[in-house]
Amino acid sequence: MRYGAFGLVEVVGSSNAIIVTDQMLKTADVSFLTRNGKCGGHETVFVTGDVSAVTAAVQAVKENPPCDVCFAAVISNPSEEAVRLAEEDAQKHGFMKKTNTKK
């Protein structure tokens, strides 16, 4: 699948990840892709959409954070490897169905 951009926001705690996701989805025309949990309770939320929508969603969180934001970034035109990593994570967590790429 091809994505215009990825938006990544890292927070501490699953509840905060849900709140940040909700804010981004309500702010712009973006779609939730996956989330990634790390040591110490850090959660990174991934959204996708066109570059302007993803930028608006991430900027809204940075300008009016509902909680402490550890990191926020926009990756425009993500590489095939970045897409593969994000989609594998989404499949692992059940947010995306696995597809058979073998022919």
Predicted regions and their residues:
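Helix N-cap motif at beta-to-alpha junctions
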Residues: 48-54
